[in-house]
């Protein structure tokens, strides 16, 4: 099947077949990343603008690398260097950028739904690199790819997601993707960080304790506390949080012995993950980062409608 979307804004907007296509393409893209010369002419002549209104290390860098490895011209713009600091609106910024004829705009923005707003008004493709607490589709895809690498499948696996569910766009993309692919998703976190009606996000089980969520889990995805989105303190302190919802060698034993431990980054060591676990044999955090480049190459490729050229 072909990929028929101009934009990639949320995994919930995609079908199971489309998610499988993106993951399959990412698997093929990894061969390029293993070469001595990591470049193919697939997107030669295309222009990609990475427009980031929020800070980012992994996502922005990997989107830039992904574009360059496909031979696209990439331009990076951050909020601090844009006219947003002078009061320019998002739409005016986007319209001015579109006047320069880019093919794809990859954007991260603090406002949920901002990508839908632009997609209706711009002719170029829009890829969501994270919008508020709404979604982070590339993170969801790379999480699924990383798990598929290990188990060869996603259906039937027990996936525990632990932490600040309310403010996490990663949680929403993971829930959408994993439930669509047949995984069993279990959620745990402080009641103040569990959104009302979370069951509406997908076929999930909300657990009263962390132990219930990670008991016999195949995969544990730990989320950081999104303090920049909370506006107020939702936990007494990080030490108390870590006591009940931090992953350490002792409570990791509740999961399966070979359970995968994952984290979207940045990690707050000693809060959601102990250093022993973050650096241990169960950790797949760096594999997630590695797969992020291939996944973002696949996303750029499919929204461009190009034909893969590998020579």
Curated annotation (Swiss-Prot):
Its EC number is 2.1.3.2. GO terms for biological process: 'de novo' pyrimidine nucleobase biosynthetic process; 'de novo' UMP biosynthetic process; amino acid metabolic process. Carbamoyl phosphate binds at residues 58-59, 108, 136, 139, 265-266. PROSITE patterns: CARBAMOYLTRANSFERASE. InterPro entries: Asp/Orn_carbamoyltranf_P-bd, Asp/Orn_carbamoylTrfase, Asp/Orn_carbamoylTrfase_sf, Asp_carbamoyltransf, Asp_carbamoyltransf_Asp/Orn-bd. Keywords: Pyrimidine biosynthesis, Transferase. L-aspartate binds at residues 86, 169, 224. Transmembrane segments: none annotated. One of its GO terms (cellular component) is cytosol. One of its GO terms (molecular function) is aspartate carbamoyltransferase activity. It catalyses: carbamoyl phosphate + L-aspartate = N-carbamoyl-L-aspartate + phosphate + H(+). Pathway: Pyrimidine metabolism; UMP biosynthesis via de novo pathway; (S)-dihydroorotate from bicarbonate: step 2/3. The keyword Transferase applies. Heterododecamer (2C3:3R2) of six catalytic PyrB chains organized as two trimers (C3), and six regulatory PyrI chains organized as three dimers (R2). Catalyzes the condensation of carbamoyl phosphate and aspartate to form carbamoyl aspartate and inorganic phosphate, the committed step in the de novo pyrimidine nucleotide biosynthesis pathway. NCBIfam families: asp_carb_tr, PRK00856.1. Belongs to the aspartate/ornithine carbamoyltransferase superfamily. ATCase family. This is Aspartate carbamoyltransferase catalytic subunit. It comes from Geobacter metallireducens (strain ATCC 53774 / DSM 7210 / GS-15). The gene is pyrB.
